[in-house]
């Protein structure tokens, strides 16, 4: 049985196919910048879903501010271990950054039980309370985490808000688009931890090549 086995070749061929399909099916589509293109194509590569051409929203200064945050030592807080696992932490570390996910932290479990809230909400509360200045929040699964962040009167370096689902997901992301945060958001129900990680990785790869 013959099939491609080299991961670099598989990825390169995938992106070629993605570019060809966009050119054939959306000949008038224009990306706002090379980084905008890289992010959307990486999300499509992750999901095999070309709807992302139209449903990934960026605040006016999101890409500039997210890149500025990532090129300095920062803390990325994720709502799931899946999102944390998908982020290229080795590359992030070259810029002095690290990832944290508190969803299973005993403090989070206790706070969620005591307050009658989701663990995702409690994890955001704990992350907000930490003293680090350069914070990024990356949400791919929990609308309640995104809602909780929006409830806090805080300044953060950026938000990737792409929780997936039918209850609160679209609403939480819509609220993000009206916030003051530098943000990338998925419009509608689609999203996921894999999408969240793909967006962060696209930003990191861009910085590596800059």
Swiss-Prot record:
Pathway: Cofactor biosynthesis; adenosylcobalamin biosynthesis; cob(II)yrinate a,c-diamide from sirohydrochlorin (anaerobic route): step 9/10
Name of the gene this protein is made from: cbiC
UniProt xrefs under Pfam families: CbiC
Enzyme Commission code(s) on record: 5.4.99.60
Entry's transmembrane regions: none
A GO molecular function held by the record: cobalt-precorrin-8 methylmutase activity
Chain segments annotated as coiled-coil in the UniProt record: none
Domain of life of the source: Bacteria
Source species of the chain: Salmonella typhimurium (strain LT2 / SGSC1412 / ATCC 700720)
Name of the protein in question: Cobalt-precorrin-8 methylmutase
């Amino acid at each position: 049985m013959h099939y491609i086995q080299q991961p670099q070749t598989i990825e390169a061929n995938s992106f070629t196919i993605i570019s060809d399909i966009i050119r054939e099916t959306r000949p008038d589509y224009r990306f706002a910048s090379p980084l905008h293109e890289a992010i959307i194509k990486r999300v499509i590569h992750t999901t095999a879903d070309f709807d992302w051409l139209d449903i990934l929203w960026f605040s006016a200064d999101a890409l500039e501010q997210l890149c500025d945050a990532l090129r300095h030592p920062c803390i990325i807080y994720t709502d799931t271990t899946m999102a944390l696992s998908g982020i290229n932490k080795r590359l992030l570390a070259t810029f002095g950054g690290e990832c944290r996910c508190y969803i299973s932290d005993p403090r989070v479990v206790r706070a969620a039980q005591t307050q009658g809230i989701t663990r995702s909400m409690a994890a955001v509360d704990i992350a907000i309370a930490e003293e680090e200045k350069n914070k990024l929040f990356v949400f791919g699964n929990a609308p309640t985490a995104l809602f909780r962040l929006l409830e806090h009167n805080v300044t953060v370096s950026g938000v990737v808000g792409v929780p997936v689902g039918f209850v609160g997901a679209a609403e939480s992301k819509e609220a993000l688009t009206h916030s003051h945060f530098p943000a990338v958001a998925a419009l509608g129900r689609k999203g996921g931890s894999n999408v969240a990680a793909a967006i962060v990785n696209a930003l990191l790869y861009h910085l590596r090549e800059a």
